[in-house]
Amino acid sequence: MTWDRLLPSRKFLLAINSWYVLALVVAAISFAVLAIGPWKNEKSIEAILTELQSIDVDCALLQRNVLRAHAGLLRNYRPLMVPLGRVRSSIANLQQLFKKARVEDVGELSELLARLKSSINTTDAAVASFGAQNVVFEDSLATFNQSISSLLRTSDSRDLNAAKVPELGYLMLQFSFRPNTELALQITQSLDQLQMSTNADKVAIQEVVRNGRVILGVLPRLNETVKLVQASGTFENTKKLQRAYLEADSLARVVEQRVRTFLGAVSVFFCFGIVILVHKLRRRTDRLARRLDFEEVIKKIGVCFEDSTETKQSLKSSAEAALGTIENFFEANQCVLGLVNVTENEIAETFSASAPPPSWNERRIRKIVSLVQADEHGSIFRDYPARKASCFNEDAPGRWALVAFKVSDRLVAVFGLRFDRDPVQPASSEVQLMELAAGCVSHYVVIRCKQTQRDILERRLKHAERLEAVGTLAGGIAHEFNNILGVILGYAMAQNILHRRTYARHYIDRINAESNRARLIIDQILALSRRRERTARPFNLSALVREIAPSLRVALPSEVEVDFNIQSAQMIVEGNPLEIEQILMNLCKNAAEACIGTGRIEDSVYRSFVWKHKVLANGTIPAGDYILLSFEDNGGGIGQAALPHIFEPFFRTRAQCGGTGLGLSTVHGHVSAMAGFVDVISTVGRGTRFDIYLPTSAKKPVNSESFFGPEKIPLGSGEIVAVVEPDPVTLERYEETIAAFGYEPVGFNTFKGLTDWVLAGKEADIVLIDHSSFLDGERVGSWVATLEKVPIIMIGQHQKNVSISADGEASNHFLQKPVSSKALAYVVRANIRTE
């Protein structure tokens, strides 16, 4: 996976997580280093203990040297000063080491170090005092001994014995080794006696007495000083300091061990956190990679639906290709999608990526749909059922992962993935991907269906526009063509004036019949263009087809064989027989043109019941009872590209045949007008079949003669009929026709001529006015005020902006052109004033 493929938000999240991992790694290493690294300087500890031992040794050496100096074994006092200097140096070193080890502020150690320093200072002072006193003692003792010896050489022995000088020397020797009070008293007495001697050397005696007394005074103090040095607290303070330091060090080591354990635990915890975070990052990376792959799948699904054609086959192939992409992505063995119509509670569309598609269990489908509709918190239904609990029948092996959701208010999508293996429950992220994939395909399918419906509506709109064009064309030629038919019908109907039958009357009747049929054809064209209301009545379709069959055989080429398969039972539909005649003629002519050389056309009429909603090539048909009018040929067939457009006006598949392109459009218009449906099945090279479904009618059928048959024309009794027609030829025809019906015609070229005639005192029983008599649709209420209650009949198009009655009480009627003589006779007879 590359960073370029990630969204900025995903890059930011991954960057944050990477910094988290880096921070945890640094923290874990730091805590591990702190846990295993040295905390205390072992050299400092060793140096402190060495200095303490050195103080012990130097103090012991000092005490020994003091004793040796006191015993006179030392020639100088350097052996005393050297250990004392080392002790002072050790104290200074201890202070520096304690400061370096950061234990100088520890209360007990600081106090013990102060005591040790104080005891050393005391010892130092005692040693200094010992040195001074010992010098005085040794000098005095040497002088004393020398003076005693001098007295013994120079003085009389009798005087010396009397003064106990020899004994004094012996006592002083004893006192110097073992001083006590008794010896000091004896020596003092001896010194007093010696001082009182008169015969000896006075100077020597004075030296003996003085030095003896100095020895007696200095030696006890010297011994006390020696004892003070020997009893110095340096040893004890050193031991206490050593024990306290060792205890503090041991306690510090325990704390250090605990801290090390804690730091190690924290480091291990961070390591576990790193492992977990790396695992999560790996999973997130996998999910992101999965998402990226899924985005590629979504793009491929979009590509599958980029087909420009909107046919049903294209939709099926696109959906199957998209489902195949999803099937490969999830490594499934089959992928299916069903769209359920909620209103009709049935499956509208099914798609499968792999063949054969599974058969759906409608009962389980309805249950799933009900669960989706009953879900209040969302329209998603997820399930991973056992092998025998999915929405498919038992012929669908494997285990299915199902997702059902609402596509719209009318559609529920059921999406399934089949796995031949028995996988574990899918993760929530995989379920979300399934939902997104199913929703994407469903969305494209619905969009394609809507596009198809839109195209159908567009074709219908174009169809309506072309019909409008046909209507405009028909309206443009209707006036002239209707005038021609009117003249033909008018003069043909003049035969009613003749009371005797002639040989030519038969031909005139044929002229009337064909003119009436031409008028009906014009009416059908105008009805197709929505310019005239169609006439619909119930009739027997099977009887009508039997009646028309001979004419169809004659109208088609002899090389084309036409077979009719018509059920004998009555098949009542509601419509216009002429529409059925045009449907039969157009479809049979198209079938004959599709047959190359010899061909065969089979026309069938029978009842057909559609049990459920059915999809046709040109729409859908609801369930119900229908009359099926089927046309099947073995011609060349219709190509798939042309099939969606065959009902469009002016669309021609065979330009060389010279057709107008209105045949199938007229068929579709007539079938739609009869509330019917058209289905087309065509295979190129094999033929085409048109199935026309017409709804049945329960009404009583009428005879076909009610549409075309002759009726007796009502005649007048000399009533006055006023006619307003600008065209002189048409006016003459109206006058002749009205006269033939037994009325008295009065013709006018303008409406003003009629009003002038009325104002002159004339009166008409009924007035016929051509719509072209009103210039620019002007209001002529003031002109027709003189007509009072005379019935008025307008001929031509109904002009809503033309008022033809002054008081609104007169009966007004409109006759569409062309006006047949029969229709004119009926309207005049029904509305003429008889008072």
Curated annotation (Swiss-Prot):
Phosphohistidine: residues bearing it: 479
Modified residues (4-aspartylphosphate): 770
Keyword hit for Nucleotide-binding: yes
Pfam families (alphabetical): DAHL (PF19443), HATPase_c (PF02518), HisKA (PF00512)
Annotated protein name in UniProt: Limited host range VirA protein
Membrane topology: Multi-pass membrane protein
Source organism of the structure: Rhizobium radiobacter (Agrobacterium tumefaciens)
Disulphide-bonded residues: none
Catalytic activity: ATP + protein L-histidine = ADP + protein N-phospho-L-histidine
InterPro entries hit by this protein: CheY-like_superfamily, DAHL, HATPase_C_sf, His_kinase_dom, HisK_dim/P_dom, HisK_dim/P_sf, Sig_transdc_His_kin-like_C, Sig_transdc_resp-reg_receiver
Top-level EC class as recorded in UniProt: transferase
Ranges of residues in domain Response regulatory: 720-832
CDD domains linked to this entry: HisKA
Annotated localization: Cell membrane
Gene3D superfamilies: 1.10.287.130, 3.40.50.2300, Histidine kinase-like ATPase, C-terminal domain (3.30.565.10)
